[in-house]
């Protein structure tokens, strides 16, 4: 399974490219990648960049896929799946828990479903902490062509998805969903 790191966002709330912002002397995206590399079921990490930050992302030495659409996470996942099945995360998720990710990938492999996505009991999904089959790409393509850009809606529209009930999991695993959106979010990781 590929670990795909979405890195083609606009960082509007953060004010500068948050993925290159150094935390304890290391760019945010590398903190995220380090966590992904700790997953025993992830064999290779790729970065899904925008045309704008492609060069900066290539500096890190990982395979880079360019997302030419950059219409949000949906085109990031679409681009990632061109390389095969992938576990997809945002590059702004430095608190990923490898054990949790391995758990989802195991459920994905056992289920034979098109995707395996954590879901809260209120129906809210965590699509940037989920496993996707390369076959899900066709569904995304159809949605994108129709101008339907919400990744969560694309998942909900698919019939063969396996959902993981978050409330049934260890409480500590919820930390894995933490993502940096604003400068003040950094307090939570810079102790
Ligand atoms: N490849 C790709 N990645 C994206 C795209 N949009 C968002 N991402 C990434 O997905 C993750 C979560 O997105 P957001 O938190 O909304 O990030 P953002 O768009 O950079 O930030 P805001 O402008 O503040 O919403 C981040 O790591 C982004 O870099 C996109 O269009 N393409
Ligand atoms: Mg975010």
Curated annotation (Swiss-Prot):
Annotated domain remarks: The N-terminal domain determines nucleotide recognition and specific binding, while the C-terminal domain determines the specific binding to the target protein.
EC number: 2.7.7.77
Name of this protein: Probable molybdenum cofactor guanylyltransferase
Pfam families to which the protein is assigned, alphabetical: NTP_transf_3
Classification via InterPro entries: MobA-like_NTP_Trfase (IPR025877), Molybde_CF_guanTrfase (IPR013482), Nucleotide-diphossugar_trans (IPR029044)
Organism of provenance: Pyrococcus abyssi (strain GE5 / Orsay)
Catalytic activity: Mo-molybdopterin + GTP + H(+) = Mo-molybdopterin guanine dinucleotide + diphosphate
GO terms (BP aspect): Mo-molybdopterin cofactor biosynthetic process
Protein residues bound to GTP: 6-8, 18, 67, 92
Compartment(s): Cytoplasm
Protein family: Belongs to the MobA family.
Cofactor(s) the protein requires to work: Mg(2+)
Protein origin, superkingdom: Archaea
SUPFAM superfamilies in the cross-refs: Nucleotide-diphospho-sugar transferases (SSF53448)
One example GO MF annotation: metal ion binding
